[in-house]
Structure formats: structure tokens, C-alpha cells
């Protein structure tokens, strides 16, 4: 049974049991700082289990793309070398949110495995938590699994409820027993059943885990029943496919077999059992899906994990003899295997290929040199690679530590990781010393959330419900003190979604607090940061909160145009454009987006044309609040990987429709004018556009016009005729430059003739060292050519001094380079004038900063040549 059939049968089975099919969420969890990557199917439902989110369904099923390559799941060195270690894998799952429980979950598991997939029941066994009699009875009495094949697992991890069969989301909160289903590969495979001393063998392989969240664990370790128990299950697709396809290793299943064959093709490797091919096949899945989900190789966070995986794959290709970029060519093979199940992979194939190719080209520039250093370090029979060598490979040649460790492991050598960490910390300490900063203490607020009225009003009557000084709650702020004010109602927008927080004033009679920024303390609690400029502000005071209207209006213009620009970027550059970050304030909008090449001038003009056309249309802006499902049906653009609540705000502005909680203009015409003022790259595969609107855009054009008028006046030309006048001036400049060069040639010839008489003959070589007056580098070279031609066998040094800096050139005729080298000669002189240089044996150049040493240096040339001739 193909992997595609396994996916399809799983989803259809649970759909027939009343489950809603939910699409795989991105590998980057939305708004979850505790996770680097989505590592299980339940991640996208975490807030549902915690009671912080509601869904329009109580039963769900999905096939979730997962990644484990960091933190406690960092088994990267095992990937490709064992039968079941992967970076990327797929998790089949079904969930109940307070609906069905143990009986249905286990009965359906058995039905799917034995009836739909056709696994023999006598090859399956299960584990249950030792105190979970209910699950034990379901297995033995209702499903009919013999008691000897239902294994009770106790607290085997050193504490109460610390067990392989008791699941906890965290130290406190939802938890409960679980029941795992294992497949017996047969007695010809080494290993014992779960719970036995030999359980780590490969005979019994876990394929499905049913977690029953029925308790709430308190801090003291006691548990009480949850009001609505839930079910969370997960089954690894690759493990199930291996069983259904009659193979023992996951790397032998259909999808991996195709990718391994492709890796062999691109590396010219015929032995398809080579572990390096398995590494490459695994890593193309992980890296391609990461790019599709917006993770670009970089030197920090998720981007660095991506870089580590890519470079590990490249190194294994290099090990197989591939010395040119190859890895990116596997994307098309991956799309053939998984594109139907994951349409985004197919849609983004070209961009994925380009990103991987760019990273390959970058690493191949340093890979060979780095491998030479690493091979040399290992050649002496060392047992441990020094930490400073590992750090040099990391810092200079881009070798992640685990890549160096991989190479060392193959040679039976360990890495001094402590030494590496010390070298890394030394570099970080230097960086910290160069740019120290002070971080505010976190503010803790336990009161009710505030009401935000800033969509409709810029002023609001409010009550002070919280005050903070240096991060600590206080009852009052005195004049001159900096602090944070919390109000029960506020028109101030708190920084979110790239839009900066509002500024303004909180005031009462004889009292004023200047708001310099507004930040969220919690999702629904806004902190007004600023300084008490007059009187004393107290908790409980009745105040008026007033936003700086001009600043808000300018910020709204820039935020609104960002939406229209985003749409124009996708239209002009392609649908692959994804927002990677933004900053919207009163001065400008700064928008980072996924794109592999600089945006051309012509493309910028087209983007400006489209955006300004939307502004001129002066259409109404419409904001609607609706549930997330309805919003999706409207076709509103959702930021990939962003986490949205049960209700969202859909913003229609011009022809753009996005989810956004920011503040915006009422009509597109309120934006006034749009101009792109900057385009640059901020990381591999990420571009940045900066743009201005309204009065700032008008000022930009007025300044530009003033510059044009000034230039026209200087050139005595009407502004409209400035371009042809400039062309005329440039032609005149070129003519003058040609005349100057001709004069320099005559001067060089004249000076050369004068210098001929100064040459002295030393052992058959005519030696000349002289300083030329008013000569530039070009004149020195021209004069050198003239002298070499006339002196025949010669060694010559010419010098010039301009603005206190010394320019040197040394020339040796071809018949004399066997005795005298121009590079050595010019360095001899340069060292005496505070400089250095180099070049070919017949011609070399140098510079210096100490002109006072030049006479003696030139005088010493004859003796230097005499020693070598």
C-alpha cells in the first residue's frame, strides 16, 4: 500500500466517524514561543486542550507535517544511520475535544489497523498505564486482545505519574494515561516487548499512541478529573508504511526509495544502501518543507537549524564525490512524491529550488577549504578535535558544530565541545561589550482587560487601574517619574502586527502623563509607557486619554498602503511573495518579504503604478469581525504561520483583503500618495522595501524637484532640458579626459627619456629607482612601460607622492625575473614607507603612508638588486 493510500484511508476512515478533516498546520507554530517547530499533530490544537480556543467541531483528524531537529529532539547525528530516525516525518492523528473517550478511540484504532489496513491482529500488542483498568478492560474484554499481549506499565521514570504510559503537557495542567499499540516484526528480529529489559530492540515497534487527557495536575502533584476529557492520538506514517509495504526500515518505503534513487542519480552513486543517500533523502524533505513554510537559511533560530540540515546534506554529497551544487535538484523528485498531499510544496517548488541552490552555492565556496583544514586536523591521529579548530570551521567556513562532529565521528574522533562553547562565548562577550543595553523588568498585571475604543475614537474618558514604576506596581506616579499606566478604557493602539504603538497624553486637572509608546502587557491589557510631566497620577483617578491624532493619521496611511502594496507585490513578482516582517510608523512603512532576487527598477515602477491607482480610486475601507471559518471562506489573505483567534477582523482596502487588527484610513484616497524610497536584501531569500505616503511623499518629491532645479541652474539649462544638457556635459568631460590622458602620455615619455640617464648597470641589469612629480597611478604605469621597453634588461622602481600618501610600482623585464622578482622588490621599498604590496614577478604595486622614508628607500634599491643579481 502506497503512502498516499495510507494517508487517504486514514482521513476517510475518521471522516466516516464524524471527524472534521483539518489541514496540516505550518512547521513554524503560530505564536508559540515554547516550540521551535511543530513536532506532533496536537500542536495546532494545544490551545483547544488548554481551554483558550474554541473550534466549530469536537472531533478532528489530520495528517500533520512534523519536524524534530532541535532542543530535546535533536537526534540529527542518527538520521540516515538508523531505521527510524528522521528530521521530517508525518503524523496521522485523531482528536476528541470533550466528545468521545477511551472506548471509541481504542475500538476505532483496532478497526482501522485490522479491517482497513489489514494488519493481522496476532501481530499487535498494546500497553496501558498500570492504574488504567478501563483501558485494560477495553483491550481484553471488548476488543479481545489476549491478556498476555496487553502490558501494564507503571511509574518507571522515578516518581508518581512519571511513566512512559502517563502523558503530561507540562508540569501542571492537562494530563492522563495513554495506551500505545506495537507491531511485532517477528522473532527473527532482536528485541523484547515494551517494559522488558530488551525493549529497545527493533522487534516490537510502536506505531500508535492514544493519549487520554482526563486529569488536571496541580503543583503538588495531585490530580483531579477534568470536566470534559479529551483524546489525542498520533501514528507515524513512515512506520506504518514500512509495515504495510513489508519492509523493516523506514528508508525502504516508497517515498524514501524514490528520493534515495534520485540522490544516487545526482551524486553518481550506484550503491543505494549508502547511508549518505539516506541522509540526503531525509534532509530534502525537511529543508523543502521548511522553505515552503517560510524558513530561510540564516545564522539564528529556525533559520540556523535549516542551514545546519542543508549543509549536512551537502557535506554527505561531497563525501560521495559531488563537488558542485546538487541538492536543489531533488525538489522536483520530492514534489512527485508528496506534492499531491501538500499542494503548497508543489506551488512553491521553484522558490524552494532557488533558496536551496543559493545556500548550496554559498556553502560550496568554503566547503573544500574547510574540509582541508578539518582533514589536516584529523590526520595526526588525534583523539579529540580542539574546540578552537571546530570554532574556526564554524566561524570562518560556515561548518555547524554537528557537521564537524559528523566528520569526526566517522574518523573515530570526538570534538572538544566545551572548548568550542568557550570560543563561542568569547566572541559573544565581545559583541555584548560593543553594544550593551538595559532591559525593563517584566510587568505583571492581574486585573481585568481594558476596552479598546481606538478604531472609533482618539479621545476617551477613562479610569487609571494600574501604575508601574521600574516594573513594580505602585499607587502613584510623581512628576518626573517614568512609568507605565493601565486604563480601564483606552483609544491608544498597542504595538501589534508591525504597527507601532500610539503616543499622546493621559491627563486630568493639574495632572499630565506623556505617553511615548503603547505596548501590550497581555493580549487585552495595554500599557501606556511614558513620563509623568505634571502633578501626581494615582490609581483610581478619572482621566482623559488623548491620542496624538496627526501621528496616528500618518501611521494609518502607512499601514493601509502596506496592505495594498503587499497585493501589488504578489501580482508583479509572483504568488510566492510572503510577508516576513514589517514596521509601520508615522514616517514610513518597512516591509520584508520572501523573494530571491532584487526588485528591478521597472518592477518598482509597476508596483507604484498599481498602488497609486488604488489610492486614486478612493474606495471605501471596510472592516468586519467574523469567525475564522467565515473569514477563510471570503478568501482573505492570512499570514502564513500566524496564529488567529476564534474571531478575526477582515479588512478590505482597495482590492486587498487581509486579516488585520491595526488602524486604517476610511478611504484609499486618504493615503494621498505612495512612493518606494528603498529596496534591499536583509537575508538570503528575503527582500525589504521602504515606502512613504501622504505629506512625507509630497516632501520627497518637492526635495527632488528642488535638486533638479538647482542642477539645472548650475548647468544653465531649463529643468525640462536637463537630461540632454547632462549628456552634453558628460561628452565634454570624456573629451577632456582623453586630452588629459594624451598629455600624461607625453609627460611620461618625456620623464622616461630624462630618467634613462639615471639608470645604473649592476651585473648586467640596468637598475633605476626614481620619484616622479605630479604623477598618478596611471602615469606611473605608462612611464614604467616606456622605461622597460627602452632599458631592455632592467629592474625599475617608480614612486609618486600625492596628499602625503606614497604610490609605488616595480617592474622587472622578463629576462631578469629569474634573479629579481618585482613583488619582492616593491615590498622592500614599501616596508620603509609604512606600507605593503604585491603582484606578479614582472610587475607589482604598493602603497605607503610615510613619505619621509621614500628617499632612503629608493637609494637602497641598487644595493638590494646587487645582492640578488
UniProtKB/Swiss-Prot annotation:
It is found in: Cytoplasm. Pfam families: DHHA1 (PF02272), tRNA-synt_2c (PF01411), tRNA_SAD (PF07973). One of its GO terms (biological process) is alanyl-tRNA aminoacylation. Its cofactor is Zn(2+). The keyword Repeat does not apply. Signal peptide: none annotated. GO terms for cellular component: cytosol. GO terms for molecular function: alanine-tRNA ligase activity; aminoacyl-tRNA deacylase activity; ATP binding; tRNA binding; zinc ion binding. Coiled coil: none annotated. The keyword RNA-binding applies. Belongs to the class-II aminoacyl-tRNA synthetase family. This is Alanine--tRNA ligase. The gene is alaS.
